[in-house]
Amino acid sequence: MPINLKKVASFGSACLLALCCLWNASMVVQAAPPTLPGYAHLLNHSDISSSQRGELLLGELQCVACHETDPASADRIWVRQAPDLSAIGSRVTPQFLTDYLKNPQAHVTGTLMPNIFHTSEKQARDGAVEYLTHFLTSLGGGLAAPKMGGSDAMVQKGDDLFHSIGCVACHGPQREDQEDSLYISLKHLASKTTVDALSDFLQNPSLSRPSGRMPHLRLDAKEARALSVFLLRDQLHNPQSLAADPGEEPGLGFAYYEIDGLNALPNFEDLTAHAEGSTDQITLNLPVSKRNNNYAIRYVGQLHAPTEGSYTFISISDDGSRIVIDGQVVVDNDGIHGRRARNGKINLSAGAHDFEVQFFNGGGGAELSVAWQPPGSSGRRGVPIPSDLLTTRTGKPMIPLGSAPFVSDPQKSRMGQRMFAAMSCVSCHPLDGLAPMRKAKRLNELDPDQNQGCLGDTIRRGLPHYDLADHQRADLKAALVAHAKTNPPLSPAETVQKTMAAFNCYACHQRDGLGGPSTALAEKYFQTTFEIDLGEEGKIPPRLDHAGAKFRPEALKSILTSDKLHVRHYMATRMPSFSPELADRFSQAIGAADDQPKFTEGPSFSEEMAAHGQRFVGVTGMACITCHRIAGQDALAIQGIDLSSVYDRVQPGWFRQFLLNPAAYNPETRMPQFWPDGKSPFPDILGGSPDQQVDSIWTYLSLKNSMPLPVGITPKGQ
C-alpha cells in the first residue's frame, strides 16, 4: 500500500510522544539471552578475540540496521536480514503475534527479536501491540483456515525425519528437553502457525527468511508435511480441534473387497470391505493380503488440480476400472478384458475435487495404472498423477494452540502501520513505502560504556532490550571499540570463519578445531541410510580442514547451491542448499585461505598412464574397488564414494597429496596408506615412483563415466 509520508511525518511527533509515555520505567523481564549457535562455537576457541565475536553479534543482532556504518566497517559486519513481514499475516496467528510483540523473550526462548516494550505500563503496551497486530495480520491476506490434518503415524514419520536428516544439528533433539545455547528453540511453533503454512515454509525458507540462516533442505511436499505435523504435534490434542472437521492427509484411502463371480465393477456402497488402509499412489501393491482373482479395490480421496483447465485422465487395466471425479464418470474401462487403455476429459477448476478410482479382477492377470494430461501438456500417454496432489479427509484436525477468530480492523491497521515506522521496526523489517521516522546514532558515534544504552545495565526508554548475556555485552563493546580505531578488510581465513559461524556450518562441520556435532549427538542422531561399515566417516559430515585446497571452485559452488556432486549417498544427514552469492563468497575465501592455486596442477593425459591407473584401481593393483563404486557399478565390499565423481570435484594436487598420506588430511580416515615411507608395493611400475603411480590413477579417473572398468568389476546385468 503506498504511504503518504507527509501525513506519517505529521503523525510522527504525536506518535513518538505517545511512545515515550509507553516506555516509562518498569520491571525488566528476565529471559534467556539471544541464541546464536555459531557465536557459541566461537566462544570455545582461544584464538578468536572478543572483538571478532562482537563483530558477528553486531550483524546477527542487526545493530547496524539502526546504527549506520562506513563501508570499511560494513565489509566486516554482515547484516543478517530479518524475516520478511510483507506476508506475515498469511503464516502467523494473530494471537501469537500479540503475545510475541508484548514480550518476545518470554514466548520464544533465545529469540533475536528485542523487547520494544520493556519499560511500558501494561495498558499502554497492550494498546500499542493491538495496533501493530492489526497491521501485521493485514499483510498477506490473513492466515487461511488449516486444511491439513495429522495422525500419530504422520508424527512418527516426521519424528524419524527430523532426527535423521540433520535438523537436530541446529535445533537439538526434540525427544527430550534440550536447553542449550547451541540449539534454536522450536517449542513455540504449535501456537504460531498451521501445518499448511509451515509446510510451505519448509519447502522454500528463503521466501520469508531471506537471510539464509534457515537453509533449503530440498524437502518434497510429503517430507515437509510430515515434519510440520511432528513439529506442531501438540495441536493434535488441542481442545479447539474436537469440533473441527477432519484435516487432509497425504495419499488416498483404499478399501479391498473379495467377491466371488465378478465380471464387472460392483456397487461398492452395498459392500463391506475386507480390509482398509491408505496408499501414496494408485497401485495394486497394497499393504494387504490379496487373493489372485475375484477381488475389487476402491481408492477414494481428493485430487488437487493445480490450475483451471481441461484435464485428460487415462486408465490402463486388466480387468475393469473406472475414474470418477466430483461424482462424474470420466473414464469407464469396465468389464472383463485383457490390458486395455481408456481415457476421458473433464474441465476442472483449480483446487480440491472428489476423486475415486475403482478396479476389479475377475481372473487371470491383474494390472492397474492411472495417468493424466494436465492443461498444456503434450503426448498421448500421460504421466502419473503426482502423489502430493492426492489427499484424504481422514486426518485429525490441527488448529494452532490459543488461536481464535480474528478480523483485522482497517483503522487500527492504519494506526499500526504508522507505529511500525515510528518505532523503527521498518529498520530491520523493510516494507514498501515505509521508512523510519528518526535516525539512530552512527555506529562509530556510540559510547560502549553508556549505562543506559542498549548495552547498559539500565536500558532507557525507547531503546530495544535484547536481554544479552554478560559475555555478549562484553564482546559487543569490544567490537565497538575496535571499529572506532581501525577496520582492516577481512582476511580469507576470517571470511571463512565468519561464514561458518553466521550460517552455523559448525553444527555439522569441523574446521581448525572448531565445530562438529557433540559426541552424544553424533552417536545417537547421525547415521547412515543403509548398513555400511565406514565408521564415523560414513555418518558425520566431513571436516573442512584443507577444503579450499581439495575442491575445484565450481564444484564447491555446486555442492553449496544444489544437490549435484553430493557423493555421500550413504549419509542420512543432508547437505543444505545456500544462495549463489554466499557460495561464491565462501568458495573464493576458502580457496585463498587454503592456498588453492598450489593444488591445481595435474598430469597431462596419456593412454599409457590411464592404463596403469586402471590396473592400480582394480584387484591386480591397490584394489580401490573394494570400498569404492566406480562408474555406477557396485564396489566389491563397501559401497563408498563413486570414483567417477572424483575428477569433477577434486583438485589434482590435493588428490596426489591425500593418497600419499591420507591421515595427514583426515586423522580419522579409514583410507589406507598405500605408499608407506614413500615406497611403492609395485616397484616395477613407473619406476616405483609414488608420485607417478598416483598421477596414473588420476589420469584414469579423468575419464569419468567413460573409463574402462578395472579388473574385478563385472558390469551390472552380466
List where the protein language model places each region:
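N-terminal secretory signal peptides that target proteins for export/translocation
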Residues: M1-V8
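Bacterial N-terminal signal peptides
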Residues: G12-A25
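Electrostatic cytochrome c docking/interface patches
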Residues: A32-G59, S138-H163, H237-N238, A244-D245, ...
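Extracytoplasmic electron-transfer domains, predominantly the class I c-type cytochrome c fold
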Residues: A32-S49, S73-G141, E176-Q235, V407, ...
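Short tyrosine-centred short linear motifs in exposed loops/low-complexity segments
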Residues: Q62, G166, E223, T307-F313, ...
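Short, cysteine/histidine-rich loop/knuckle motifs that typically chelate Zn2+
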Residues: A65, A169, S427, A507, ...
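Cys/His-rich metal-chelating microdomains
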Residues: T69-D70, P173-Q174, L431-D432, R511, ...
